[in-house]
A protein has these predicted regions:
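Lumenal/extracellular ectodomains and adaptor appendage modules
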Residues: 1-155
Length: 155
C-alpha cells in the first residue's frame, strides 16, 4: 500500500495511518486477502497547516491476483506496473475525522496446511503506519512499521 498526500499543506503531520491485512485461507489452500487502510486526520481545519487530507493510494499485489471487491471513495485505475497488479484510488479525509478504503482479492497461488507463509512488508518513507495482520480471524501481528520486515507464520 502506497499513500500520497496530493493536497499540499502540512496534513501529513496530523494524520495517523493503520493498514490491516485480513487473510482468509480456504480449505483448498486458496488465499483471499482484504487490505484496509484507515486514515485519521487528528487536527482541526486552520487554512494553512491542515485541511481535507487528499490521498492517492495504490495497492501493489502479485500479478494474477483477482479483485473481488473494493470499498473506495473514487476509483482511479487498474494497471500492471513493475510486475505487479496495481489498484489505485483517491480518498478525502476532513479534519477531525477518519476514512477507510479497502480492497479484497484472491491471490494467484495456493498454500498447503502446515507450510510456512512469508510476507514482505516494505515501509514507505514519510510516515509510520500501524500494521495489523489477521489470519483466519486471529490477530497474529500488531506493530508500528518502522522498517521493511519479512513476517513468517505457519498455515
Amino acid at each position: 500500500m502506497n499513500n500520497s498526500n496530493v493536497a499540499g499543506l502540512k496534513g501529513n503531520f496530523f494524520t495517523k495511518f493503520a493498514i490491516e491485512q485480513d487473510i482468509a485461507i480456504k480449505d483448498d489452500g486458496t488465499l483471499v486477502k482484504k487490505v484496509t487502510t484507515t486514515i485519521n486526520n487528528t487536527f482541526r481545519y486552520d487554512g494553512w497547516l491542515n485541511a481535507v487530507y487528499q490521498n492517492w493510494l495504490r495497492l501493489y499485489v502479485p500479478e494474477g491476483s483477482k479483485l473481488i471487491e473494493k470499498n473506495i471513495e473514487i476509483d482511479l485505475e487498474q494497471k500492471n506496473e513493475l510486475g505487479k497488479e496495481v489498484w489505485a484510488a483517491f480518498s478525502r479525509t476532513p479534519p477531525l475525522s477518519s476514512t477507510s478504503s479497502s480492497f479484497t482479492y484472491e491471490l494467484p497461488f495456493k498454500v498447503k496446511k502446515g507450510s510456512t507463509y512469508k510476507m514482505l512488508i516494505q515501509k514507505q518513507g514519510g510516515y509510520i503506519p500501524r500494521m495489523i495482520i489477521v489470519v483466519n480471524g486471529k490477530k497474529l501481528f500488531d506493530f508500528d512499521l518502522k522498517k521493511d520486515i519479512e513476517l513468517e507464520f505457519k498455515i
